[in-house]
Amino acid sequence: MSRTSLEVKAKRKPKFSARAYNRCPICGRPRGYMRKFGICRICFRNMSLRGELPGVRKSSW
């Protein structure tokens, strides 16, 4: 199935709640999803490096 059809399928309410899973709303990626921000790790990295996520900065120690 194409990515867009899988995104539409994921948005529907499943018959059983255990079947529901999160997808990144930007790219549609099902893995590496960060609940706190609601996006995948790759989109999180891109947005944080561009400064689009307030309060997030690159760590340094």
Curated annotation (Swiss-Prot):
Q: Which GO terms describe its biological process?
A: translation
Q: Which NCBIfam families match?
A: PRK08061.1
Protein's organism: Oleidesulfovibrio alaskensis (strain ATCC BAA-1058 / DSM 17464 / G20)
User: Which superkingdom does the taxonomy of this entry point to?
Assistant: Bacteria
Q: Quaternary arrangement and interactors, per the entry? A: Part of the 30S ribosomal subunit. Contacts proteins S3 and S10.
Which coenzyme or cofactor does it need?
A: Zn(2+)
Annotated Gene Ontology MF terms? Answer: rRNA binding; structural constituent of ribosome; zinc ion binding
Its name, as the record gives it, is Small ribosomal subunit protein uS14
Where, in this chain's numbering, is Zn(2+) bound? 24, 27, 40, 43
Residue ranges annotated as coiled coil are none
Q: Which Pfam families match?
A: Ribosomal_S14
